[in-house]
Amino acid sequence: METQDYAFEPGLTVGELLKSSQKDWQAAINHRFVKELFAGTIENKVLKEYLIQDYHFFDAFLSMLGACVAHADQLESKLRFAKQLGFLEADEDGYFQKAFKELKVAENDYLEVTLHPVTKAFQDLMYSAVASSNYAHLLVMLVIAEGLYLDWGSKDLALPEAYIHSEWINLHRGPFFAEWVQFLVDELNRVGKGREDLTELQQRWNQAVALELAFFDIGYDA
């Protein structure tokens, strides 16, 4: 990781999984989208398309958190996932509603939309983790979805003035979000400890990181 160094520890599960995806990871956190978002120069049509597509991860993401409540092997872990579910409803969904209003996106335009192939592929990968009922596979998806965003969100750059730009950054930085990502990393390192074969987890990891990178292109392709 570039701005967060706690996860990349050689010998631990997350550090090992990250090795083969470093190129895509670095390309994602330094993507044109990220640079323009921080600069406040991102075009509304680009951000609009990105957010409309991103909104359709919400159900799959909630399903992954719910599956972690069900399949985590420790009560303390289950409670932490339950806590995060409440945060998503209060803060992240609130941002989407305000952003759609500011960008003049009608409800039908973000609810009834044709999913981009990248969005659909990412959704399918999330739901496959849910269907697996496998805690390690769920954690892989969450560490990438949250850790990669913390990595770019924590860049030491000035925040843009517009709410729709700055708040999307703020949602993916700060002590609370960093603590959440640290928890996910620690959990994956814990459940992966002693696991001799990381092949399946590595395949899922690499696929998810590649999709994260491709997703940033969506608004520019529209």
Feature locations, PLM:
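Basic/polar N-terminal segments that are highly enriched at the extreme N-terminus
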Residues: 1-15, 222
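Acidic interhelical loop/turn segments
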Residues: 159-166, 189-198
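Hydrophobic alpha-helical segments
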Residues: 11-18, 100, 125-128, 217
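Short alpha-helical hairpin
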Residues: 2, 18-42, 61, 183-194
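Active-site-proximal alpha-helical scaffolds that flank and shape metal-associated catalytic sites
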Residues: 76-179, 210
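Alpha-helical bundle segments that constitute or directly flank the non-heme di-iron/ferroxidase center
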Residues: 22-27, 42-71, 87, 91, ...
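Short, contiguous, pocket-lining structural segments
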Residues: 49-60, 87, 114, 176, ...
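Long hydrophobic alpha-helical segments typical of transmembrane helices together
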Residues: 192-222
